[in-house]
Design a protein with these regions (language model features):
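Flexible, acidic/Gly-rich N-terminal and inter-domain linker regions that tether
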Residues: 1-74, 83-84, 310
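Auxiliary Fe-S-binding modules of radical SAM enzymes
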Residues: 1-30, 233-312
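Fold-independent oxyanion-binding glycine-rich loops
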Residues: 21, 51, 64, 108, ...
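Iron-sulfur cluster-binding cysteine motifs and their immediate structural context
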Residues: 46-53, 71-93, 99-115
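Short cysteine/histidine-rich metal-coordination sites, predominantly Zn2+-binding motifs
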Residues: 61-66, 86, 90-99, 116-127
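Short glycine-enriched, charge-decorated loop/helix-capping segments at active-site entrances
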Residues: 62, 203-209, 278-286
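Conserved AdoMet/S-adenosylmethionine-binding subsite of the radical SAM
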Residues: 120-276
Length: 312
């Protein structure tokens, strides 16, 4: 996909809010991936592993375990934690003075998460991994929900295509269809999260019902796009054999095949991030699934003739 010089320059100047670029990943798409994490998400899943992705704006995080009470920056000291948490609830604009002093934190306990970056800047980082992609690897847009920043997504994907880099995007599915329709031709793989088919339970535990999500999944499959359905296996929410069979039966009603179903076992790696954001972890933990239980759920998917992976 060749780009004219002026078109490339315009794409490279497109801006978005990025909170992480994970290089050399073996997850979130085939082969070796460079995962670009974008801020902003319409859902509020209780088990979210990346709570720092939910708000669109950059946020302050304080990792108390790294704080050494140096006194160089009062807001970073655990002795001042109550005052910091109160300040944390104010808008990011009121942190402008703090932004100038964050470098004083000697351990990195206090830091901003999320920054405005240009597509050209991000792609310069992505291209460093290009030699390792081989036949299957490439760029994955994730988050957060990438489609909340559609112009930035389109710029990154078009620049990647122009560089001969394969593309993928993970989505929660809750966005306007015309945004999906514009991005799908730029994607080699769409990683589509399906968390729960029951609309009431979906609303209760994510903050939104699933009608638009499932409608968009049907539309995406109908276009002939390569779609992988991704399911976070959350004990107490969607991780029983009955839940998985219901999902499989739904997938078989779609207007075309999916490439695979990826089962993603629940973990608590995001729990410390809630504390760093001054928020309580909202999910009431239950015993994790054993390896045998996960394998049994995968076998249910395979028994209906659908390719399945564990871990994504």
């Amino acid at each position: 996909m060749a780009l004219a010089r002026t078109e490339r320059q315009e794409l490279e100047q497109t801006q978005g809010v990025v909170f992480n670029v994970q290089r050399m990943s073996m997850h979130d798409g085939p082969g070796v991936r460079t995962n670009v994490f974008l801020k902003g998400c319409p859902l509020r899943c209780g088990w979210c592993a990346n709570p720092e992705s939910q708000q669109m704006q950059p946020e302050l995080m304080l990792r108390a375990g790294q704080c050494i009470d140096c006194g160089q920056f009062a807001e970073s000291c655990t002795a001042c934690m109550p005052a910091w948490q109160a300040a944390r609830r104010r808008s990011a604009i009121q942190f402008e003075a703090i932004d100038d002093r964050i470098h004083l934190c000697p351990t990195g306990a206090l830091n901003w998460v999320g920054e405005w970056r240009t597509a050209g800047d991000v792609m310069a980082q992505v291209r460093r991994d290009h030699p390792f992609y081989g036949d299957g690897g490439g760029l994955t847009l994730t988050g957060g929900e990438p489609t909340l920043q559609p112009a930035f997504c389109a710029a990154l994907l078009r620049l990647a295509k122009a560089a001969g880099i394969a593309t993928a995007m993970e989505t929660c599915g809750h966005t306007q269809w015309d945004i999906f329709a514009a991005l799908l031709p730029l994607l080699d793989v769409l990683l589509f999260d399906v968390k729960q088919l029951d609309p009431v339970r979906h609303l209760e535990h994510t903050g939104l019902d699933n009608a638009l999500i499932l409608e968009n999944l049907r539309h995406a499959v109908a276009t002939g796009a390569t779609v992988r359905v991704r399911v976070p296996l959350i004990p107490g929410f969607n991780a029983t054999p009955e839940d998985v069979m219901t999902l499989v039966e739904f997938v078989q009603t779609l207007p075309g095949p999916v490439q695979a179903i990826d089962l993603l076992p629940y973990h608590t790696l995001g729990k410390a991030k809630y504390a760093a954001l001054g928020r309580e972890y909202p999910w009431q933990e239950q015993p994790r699934l054993s390896l045998q239980q996960v394998e049994e759920l995968a076998a249910i998917v395979a028994s209906r003739g659908i390719a399945v992976t564990v871990g994504g």
